[in-house]
Amino acid sequence: MKKYKSEISGHLDIIVTENEDNFEGEKETWKEIQIHGDPEGLKSFARLLIKLADLRQDDLDELPVGAREHIHLKPKYDLSVSSEEVIVGRLDAKGTGAFYGKYISKEFK
């Protein structure tokens, strides 16, 4: 059996926090994704993002048309034990460039 080799080196912690605030009697709730790491962990995460961004999906025979390349980052193996599992991937689909249906673009002003 081949030993798992993480693309993340150093220390990287990715957590979700739930926040709540009351303003003028109105309760507001929101979530935040927090990404923290030591220099080595942050740099290896950056390299992973650049690798995904530069990847030519159309050249991947094993990736079906319409699919999106992605990588799973798992607590204990890639991330700290306190982290949530994270999937980092391309928004654009192979062959079509289409974004998935749930995507809502940010507003440009």
PLM-predicted stretches and their roles:
Residues M1-K109:
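Positively charged, low-complexity terminal tracts
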